């Protein structure tokens, strides 16, 4: 029998001790003191960070919103039906993150970045914090590239540039979402990733939007984030921040993105609900004092970055719903003061058949003019003024019947320009075609066409140009300006078309 050597035994024991790992998991755990309306009061989590993700033993998750002396107010993501007094809560020591990158494109997600379209998991290793600091002044560049929506009234009168924040505001059922969807459809082939964030919308409405995007082939460069009316207030509050985190990824990787928040009125209401349950003091219209800050920190993240940072951009089109056209309410005035202009949609215009129902007088773009192409500037330079004078004359003619010849002519021209700016939904127009039809209206080529036939004139003009003079459209597209030769050619083409056009 071989004897065991003492050295061997000691070396084996030493080896075992050296490689011994204590398999124990340290966790900071607290207990739920009370739970109601999607908010849990948790005791015993002293080292928790603001907006840190916390896990409940029931499998629910939430974020620490209120950090008090002896307890933490936690917003629960779902409805937390199984959470009750005594439920244990664990720290994750991480802030809220969502998946980003090309893996999310073409998908429908919830506010947490989880897929809800039945197309399987999102396969990505890239995640981003939903709360990020907005780029500073030195990291930005002034807006100078156009972001065309394909809507004549917007691209000519309220132009939007890449990196701009342009508010779409109006009563319900005035076509706000349609304007935003048109803008997404028009980004096809422009290398712009589009993110549509639905906040507090009906599930059926969101399904319709997704169907429209799929129908026009826009879903292949879009992401839809849905926090519907049936979701909790916490999900509705988080959705825009998840969306902007996904948009920032493309902005920071020298690419371009467009984000639509539909709509921020419902976002403010969701935040008000959470704040009141957290017992925060209410202010005007029962909104908490920091309701301005939740929107300003969200919209400031849309920017055009400087060349050193890759020259990427994130453009934001927030939507706000007004009550009976009241733009002086609390949330509308807040967001008007944050954004770089607004597109105001009016119920009266909508029902009188002027669609998109854009009130040109109240709509403005504070920085987009610098991004407008020269050709559009040339043809629509006096358009806003002409339309304002037409509206003034129109109001005057309701009382006075006899008008001088010049006023009559102005009235006739104005009526035709209003018709020119009409556009069917989901049919965005390339900028070169917009230039042609606005030029035709502004230079009097439509004066002999009856007002009712202006839309028909336009519908026939575009196929005529594409078939016989595609080089005219091509030149406008490449030159981005109307020089003397191109203008002369355009006049010749329009005169020729007028001869062939029959009403």
Swiss-Prot record:
Family the entry assigns: Belongs to the ATPase alpha/beta chains family.
Membrane topology: Peripheral membrane protein
GO cellular component terms, semicolon-separated: plasma membrane; proton-transporting ATP synthase complex
Subcellular location per the Swiss-Prot or TrEMBL entry: Cell inner membrane
Catalytic reaction equation(s): ATP + H2O + 4 H(+)(in) = ADP + phosphate + 5 H(+)(out)
GO molecular-function term, one example from the UniProt record: ADP binding
EC number(s) from the headed UniProt entry: 7.1.2.2
Domain of life: Bacteria
Keywords noted in UniProt: ATP synthesis, ATP-binding, Cell inner membrane, Cell membrane, CF(1), Hydrogen ion transport, Ion transport, Membrane, Nucleotide-binding, Translocase, Transport
Name under which the protein is recorded: ATP synthase subunit alpha
Function (record text): Produces ATP from ADP in the presence of a proton gradient across the membrane. The alpha chain is a regulatory subunit.
Positions of ATP binding: 170-177
Gene that encodes the chain: atpA
One annotated GO biological process: proton motive force-driven ATP synthesis
InterPro entries: ATP_synth_asu-like_sf, ATP_synth_asu_C, ATP_synth_asu_C_sf, ATP_synth_F1_a_nt-bd_dom, ATP_synth_F1_asu, ATPase_a/bsu_AS, ATPase_F1/V1/A1_a/bsu_N, ATPase_F1/V1/A1_a/bsu_N_sf
Subunit and partners: F-type ATPases have 2 components, CF(1) - the catalytic core - and CF(0) - the membrane proton channel. CF(1) has five subunits: alpha(3), beta(3), gamma(1), delta(1), epsilon(1). CF(0) has three main subunits: a(1), b(2) and c(9-12). The alpha and beta chains form an alternating ring which encloses part of the gamma chain. CF(1) is attached to CF(0) by a central stalk formed by the gamma and epsilon chains, while a peripheral stalk is formed by the delta and b chains.
Residues flagged as site, Required for activity: 363
